[in-house]
Design a protein with these regions (language model features):
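Conserved non-catalytic scaffold segment of RNase H-like nuclease domains
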Residues: 2-139, 170
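Acidic two-metal-ion nuclease catalytic site recognized across multiple nuclease folds
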Residues: 2-8, 212-223, 234-235, 248-302
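Short, charged/polar N-terminal "headpieces" of proteins
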Residues: 7, 18, 23-29, 42, ...
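Short, function-defining helix-loop hinge/capping sites that tune catalysis or transport
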Residues: 28-30, 134, 200-203, 258
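Active-site-proximal helix-loop-helix substrate-binding element of RNase H-like nuclease domains
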Residues: 74-93, 167, 171-181, 187-251, ...
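Short, polar/flexible loop-turn hinges at active-site or ligand-entry regions and domain interfaces
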Residues: 95-101, 145, 238-244, 268
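Short mixed-charge
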Residues: 142-185
Length: 302
């Protein structure tokens, strides 16, 4: 993984922000069955670990920043809802070593706003979640937390969560722009490393064969896995690589993925979010029908 090469920014150079976050959710989800908690966690994410890198097109890292958000991490009823809540000792160790900063949301976001101000575009592996759900909902939560109506708002959110669990959510008519991250009255061009990886790195026979040989299929068996973890395994040749699922470590590998995408895309950074990008690769069934030598390795009963 490439290390930071500088902390000085040349305005003539083009920089890009690669962001990752780890999230919990509202305390009303605690104690629910895992499938119900997952629904709420996807719809109502609260960021406790926020990290990003600033890179150039070659993947050189000019800045790495990583923050634990005190309003989420330091509140057990919220942090305990996190899928990776068992990593709490790891974060405490990072704090002791000075590898991460514990601060409030508004302080962390002020640093993020600076980073956004010097970059050409921003992205993440699954930008839809990070930029369209996690950051906006955490911003909303924090604003409500410091308002007089917080408990009333939280009760309303509990009702919303009940509808989510029961699949009775009313449709959202808010305008959605797949090319833009809007935050605090400003707009930033947005790219999605997941979709770009599927397009430029993974939609080939070599990757699909690697998926079959290593069992990288979705839970249903219908599609090939296209996660940041399997993508990094493939491009690095480190087939035993396990994603850290901590924000800054994941942002590091995503910075390498970004650099290879740009190289394959002839030095272009394509803006926008592709819906369901894993479909770009086609189904496992279709690939196996074209390559019958793999038929004995997969279950096509789906």
């Amino acid at each position: 993984m490439k290390k930071s090469v500088s902390v000085k920014f040349d305005r003539r150079r083009k920089y890009y922000l690669i962001l990752d976050c780890e999230t919990a959710t509202l305390p009303c989800a605690d104690g629910l069955p895992e499938n119900e908690k997952k629904k709420i966690a996807i719809a109502k994410p609260l960021i406790y670990d926020l990290g990003w890198t600033i890179v150039d097109k070659k993947g050189n890292i000019y800045l790495r920043e990583n923050y634990l958000i005190s309003e989420i991490f330091s509140v057990p009823s919220i942090f305990n809802t996190a899928y990776y809540a068992h990593k709490r000792p790891l974060y405490l160790e990072k704090l002791d070593k000075g590898e991460i900063v514990l601060t409030d949301w508004r302080t962390a976001v002020s640093r993020l706003e600076f980073a956004l101000s010097i970059t050409e575009a921003v992205g993440a592996y699954n930008a839809m979640f990070d930029f369209k759900k996690a950051i906006p909902f955490t911003e909303l939560y924090i604003n409500q937390l410091y308002s007089a109506d917080f408990h009333k708002w939280l009760s309303f959110q509990a009702e919303c969560c009940e509808r989510i669990v029961n699949d009775t959510v009313i449709g959202n008519n808010k305008e959605f722009d797949p090319n833009c991250f809007r935050f605090r009255s400003k707009e930033y061009p947005l790219f999605d490393l997941w979709g770009l990886s599927c397009q430029y790195l993974l939609d080939n026979d070599e990757y699909k064969k690697a998926c079959l040989l290593n069992g990288w299929q979705t839970e249903s068996g219908k599609y090939f896995k296209t996660s940041a973890e399997t993508t990094y395994r493939f491009i690095s040749g480190q087939m035993d690589f396990d994603e850290a699922h901590t924000a800054i470590d994941d942002a590091d590998i995503e910075s390498e993925i970004f650099a290879l995408i740009v190289k394959r895309a002839k030095n272009q950074v394509e803006i926008g979010i592709e819906y369901f990008p894993f479909r770009i690769l086609g189904t496992v069934r279709k690939f196996v029908c074209q390559h019958p030598e793999f038929a004995d390795m997969v279950n096509l009963e789906f």
